[in-house]
Amino acid sequence: MKGSHGPCSDLTVTMLENVPLAPLTTLKIGGNARWLVRPSGVKGLSRYCRTCPGDLPRFILGGGSNLLVDDNGFHGVVVDLTHTLNAIVVEHQDAHGGILRVEAGAATRKTAHVARQNGLAGLAFMAGIPGTIGGALRMNAGAYGCDVKGVLLDAQLMDATGNLHTRNAQELGLAYRHCDLPKGWIFVSARFHLARGESEAIKSQMRDYNHKRTQAQPLRYPSAGSVFRNPAGAAAWQLIDAAGLRGHRIGDAQISEKHSNFFVNLGAASSLHMEELIELARNRVAQHSGVQLTLEIGILTPQGLRTEPGR
């Protein structure tokens, strides 16, 4: 891994070549990115969008959660916003609440804590969600009956040619783990409209959420979070349980014994074994319950992102 004068090298962009992706993901699986780009800020990101060759596949990396990277890596450009586009600012505050502006590379957990410190309620559910605000927007992240849609005022996005746009929650089509993000567009920042809250009460709520997470989720081993979306009227983990797969293992890839919708890396899991385990779970659940599970995680292959298993 080294700095390079790559295909979109520029003073406003840091470019690295052949970067291992496994350490940058919560699952700790995957090969190298051909290039990794860290724009210096919004202007650097715009410059990148305008000058980087269009034939190079591109992937926006947030906190690396909800992601399985192929062992053969990614033969394109990974864009990392976490080092520069990570500001969290209170734009407005009064007796009723305030507006928190957060750049896409900021961590969701840090965002929740900054809101609490400023007496702003509504983001406590993010305290236990790994990843970044950009990723949270992309999948309308949520927990404990709350989600991004419920608190989002608007978001700033950049199109494939480097121009900025603003969209509200309705225009983004936010729904359960879904967002109508135009192809090639990148989240730059978001503004959250939050109610006034008492800092200690919010802290207690966050502590309660984190306790529930510790009790329910397998935090001992690397995972990508929930592998499948919950189908209507059911919980994915219950369907996987009913199919008799709790604890099932292929190599070092395992369906967690603690939570069946979390697939963990016991130490040296390969992407092949993890995908085989995902496909096994889908097939068994379909046979047992007649339900076709849909992936919540993405699979980054050498050619780009897939949202369905299959090599």
Swiss-Prot record:
<keyword id="KW-0132">Cell division</keyword>
<keyword id="KW-0285">Flavoprotein</keyword>
<keyword id="KW-0573">Peptidoglycan synthesis</keyword>
<feature type="active site" description="Proton donor">
    <location>
        <position position="226"/>
    </location>
</feature>
<keyword id="KW-0131">Cell cycle</keyword>
<protein>
    <recommendedName>
        <fullName>UDP-N-acetylenolpyruvoylglucosamine reductase</fullName>
        <ecNumber>1.3.1.98</ecNumber>
    </recommendedName>
</protein>
<dbReference type="Pfam" id="PF01565">
    <property type="entry name" value="FAD_binding_4"/>
</dbReference>
<dbReference type="InterPro" id="IPR003170">
    <property type="entry name" value="MurB"/>
</dbReference>
<dbReference type="InterPro" id="IPR016166">
    <property type="entry name" value="FAD-bd_PCMH"/>
</dbReference>
<dbReference type="InterPro" id="IPR016169">
    <property type="entry name" value="FAD-bd_PCMH_sub2"/>
</dbReference>
<dbReference type="InterPro" id="IPR036318">
    <property type="entry name" value="FAD-bd_PCMH-like_sf"/>
</dbReference>
<dbReference type="GO" id="GO:0051301">
    <property type="term" value="P:cell division"/>
</dbReference>
<keyword id="KW-0961">Cell wall biogenesis/degradation</keyword>
<keyword id="KW-0521">NADP</keyword>
<keyword id="KW-0133">Cell shape</keyword>
<dbReference type="GO" id="GO:0071555">
    <property type="term" value="P:cell wall organization"/>
</dbReference>
<comment type="pathway">
    <text>Cell wall biogenesis; peptidoglycan biosynthesis.</text>
</comment>
<dbReference type="InterPro" id="IPR016167">
    <property type="entry name" value="FAD-bd_PCMH_sub1"/>
</dbReference>
<feature type="active site">
    <location>
        <position position="296"/>
    </location>
</feature>
<keyword id="KW-0963">Cytoplasm</keyword>
<comment type="similarity">
    <text>Belongs to the MurB family.</text>
</comment>
<feature type="active site">
    <location>
        <position position="177"/>
    </location>
</feature>
<dbReference type="GO" id="GO:0008762">
    <property type="term" value="F:UDP-N-acetylmuramate dehydrogenase activity"/>
</dbReference>
<dbReference type="InterPro" id="IPR006094">
    <property type="entry name" value="Oxid_FAD_bind_N"/>
</dbReference>
<dbReference type="Pfam" id="PF02873">
    <property type="entry name" value="MurB_C"/>
</dbReference>
<comment type="function">
    <text>Cell wall formation.</text>
</comment>
<dbReference type="GO" id="GO:0005829">
    <property type="term" value="C:cytosol"/>
</dbReference>
<dbReference type="InterPro" id="IPR036635">
    <property type="entry name" value="MurB_C_sf"/>
</dbReference>
<keyword id="KW-0560">Oxidoreductase</keyword>
<feature type="domain" description="FAD-binding PCMH-type">
    <location>
        <begin position="28"/>
        <end position="197"/>
    </location>
</feature>
<dbReference type="GO" id="GO:0009252">
    <property type="term" value="P:peptidoglycan biosynthetic process"/>
</dbReference>
<keyword id="KW-0274">FAD</keyword>
<dbReference type="InterPro" id="IPR011601">
    <property type="entry name" value="MurB_C"/>
</dbReference>
<dbReference type="GO" id="GO:0071949">
    <property type="term" value="F:FAD binding"/>
</dbReference>
<dbReference type="GO" id="GO:0008360">
    <property type="term" value="P:regulation of cell shape"/>
</dbReference>
